[in-house]
Amino acid sequence: MSSFLEFAKPKMLDIKRKINFASGEKTDESVQPQQQTEQSSAQQTTPSAKAVSNPFITPLTESTPGMSESWVELAPSRTSLCSSVDINMVIIDEKDKDSRLSPVSIAQSPHVEFESLEQVKYKLVREMLPPGKNTDWIWDWSSRPENTPPKTVRMVQYGSNLTTPPNSPEPELYQYLPCESDSLFNVRVVFGFLVTNIFSFVVGAAVGFAVCRKLIKHHRQ
């Protein structure tokens, strides 16, 4: 009996090895799907980790009723962009207005907005005169009220386009030109009237005499 067991022991060991090998293959096959499921779950979790790093994407929590877990991208809309652009334009316009309203000296900038015509006159006179001369008297003289005549005088004065036609002589020549008042009883008017009447009477009498003479001759024949 012992000899039989000793003889069969190697065979039994071989059978156990085969059984263990078969069971090991089964365990490997069962482990592989588990690894695949773990890899798929890891792949599913990686985009979530990437999404969390994006500040414009916020995940919906599981506490939201009636909705499954999803990702919503909060990109800036057109209305928000337009409103931001409008705000920037308003700020720029306000800055431009402030820069225009700020006082600007004549020496700093060539583009100066003068308040009145008197300041323009003063600046032109200062540019025309040589440096070093006092021009305060010119400013006082030009700013006096009597130097600016009223509108009625300016419209009636000679040389204005409102009173003289473009082809009229100069105002200085009026005193040398003969200018007389035209009336009905003037000597020239009466003389011309008489001369024209006498001439027309003579011409009419001559024409009438010629016509009458021809008629008389024709009647005698």
UniProtKB/Swiss-Prot annotation:
Topology of the protein relative to the lipid bilayer: Single-pass membrane protein
Keyword field contains Iron: no
Swiss-Prot/TrEMBL keywords: Apoptosis, Autophagy, Isopeptide bond, Membrane, Mitochondrion, Mitochondrion outer membrane, Transmembrane, Transmembrane helix, Ubl conjugation
Tissue expression profile of the protein: Expressed in all somatic tissues including neurons, pharynx, intestine, body wall muscles and vulva muscles.
Pfam families: BNIP3
Gene Ontology molecular functions: protease binding; protein homodimerization activity
Protein modification: Ubiquitinated and degraded by the proteasome. Under oxidative stress conditions, ubiquitinated at Lys-26 in a pink-1 dependent manner. Colocalizes with pdr-1 and may be ubiquitinated by it.
InterPro entries noted in UniProt: BNIP3 (IPR010548)
Official protein name in the record: NIP3 homolog
Phenotype reported upon loss of the gene: RNAi-mediated knockdown causes an increased sensitivity to stress and inhibits mitophagy which leads to an accumulation of defective mitochondria that have increased mass, altered network morphology, decreased ATP levels, increased reactive oxygen species (ROS) generation, membrane depolarization, increased oxygen consumption and increased cytoplasmic Ca(2+) that intensifies under stress conditions. RNAi-mediated knockdown in daf-2, isp-1, or clk-1 mutant backgrounds suppresses their increased lifespan phenotype.
Function of the protein: Initiates apoptosis in a BH3-independent mechanism possibly by recruiting ced-3 to mitochondria and other cytoplasmic membranes. Has a role in lifespan and tumor growth. Required for the induction of mitophagy under stress conditions.
Region of interest (Required for initiation of apoptosis), ranges: 189-209
Similarity comment: Belongs to the NIP3 family.
Quaternary structure annotation from Swiss-Prot or TrEMBL: Homodimer; via transmembrane domain. Interacts with ced-3 and ced-9.
One of the GO BP terms on file: regulation of programmed cell death
Protein localization: Mitochondrion outer membrane
Predominant location: mitochondrion
TM regions (residue ranges): 189-209
Superkingdom of this protein's organism: Eukaryota
Region called Disordered, residue ranges: 24-55
Biological classification of the source: Eukaryota, Metazoa, Ecdysozoa, Nematoda, Chromadorea
Origin species: Caenorhabditis elegans
UniProt biased composition (Low complexity): 32-49
Gene Ontology CC: mitochondrial membrane; mitochondrial outer membrane; nucleus; protein-containing complex
Crosslink feature (Glycyl lysine isopeptide (Lys-Gly) (interchain with G-Cter in ubiquitin)) location: 26
